[in-house]
Regions:
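Glycine/charge-rich catalytic "coupling/switch" loops of P-loop NTPases
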Residues: 2-5, 28, 35-71, 102-133
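Short, conserved beta-turn/loop elements at beta-strand boundaries and strand-helix junctions
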Residues: 11-17, 77-83
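A generic beta-sheet turn/junction motif
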Residues: 15, 24-26, 51, 81, ...
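Short, acidic/hydrophobic/Gly-rich beta-strand patch recurrent on exposed beta strands
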Residues: 19-25, 32, 85-91, 98
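Short leucine-rich amphipathic alpha-helices used at interfaces
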Residues: 33-34, 81
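Acidic- and glycine-rich mobile interface elements
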Residues: 89-109
Length: 133
């Protein structure tokens, strides 16, 4: 599981959903929650984000479009028959990506390269000690 420390910077809600903007350092990530919250007192609240290694999408160019696209450097690549594990350094944090080897083989990525990594807003979980925001 990938973990990032963040703080809430914005909350937009509809009847059943909320979109949270969170700051990870100077970068902004967005996540969707299946609950509504218009509480403005959540701003600047520290939170922990979590997402699975299988939800990390890699690209060797800035061609894909998603709300959560960042750059990182490739530390290690472990190619498997079915899946390849790629270890990234994003600022001071390690991000793990588990990518189908057939897909990974189409990319021009080597250890030491800078790549784009993405995770969809619906695939990020908000870890917290209490239920509800």
């Amino acid at each position: 599981m990938n973990i990032l420390k963040a703080s809430i910077t914005s909350v937009t809600s509809s009847e059943h959903l909320s979109c949270l903007g969170v700051a990870v350092g100077e970068d902004t990530f967005y996540l969707l929650l299946a609950e509504a919250s218009n509480e403005k007192n959540l701003l600047n609240t520290p939170v922990t984000l979590a997402f699975k290694e299988t939800e990390v999408i890699l690209s060797d160019t800035l061609s894909a479009a998603t709300a959560n696209m960042q750059r990182a450097s490739v530390q290690t690549i472990e190619r498997g028959i079915i899946l390849s594990q790629v270890t990234l350094t994003y600022h001071e944090t390690t991000i793990m990506a588990l990518v189908p080897t057939l897909t990974f083989n189409t990319l021009s990525i080597r250890e030491g390269d800078e790549v784009c990594w993405m995770v969809q807003p619906s695939e990020i979980s908000l870890l917290r000690e209490t239920h509800g925001i």
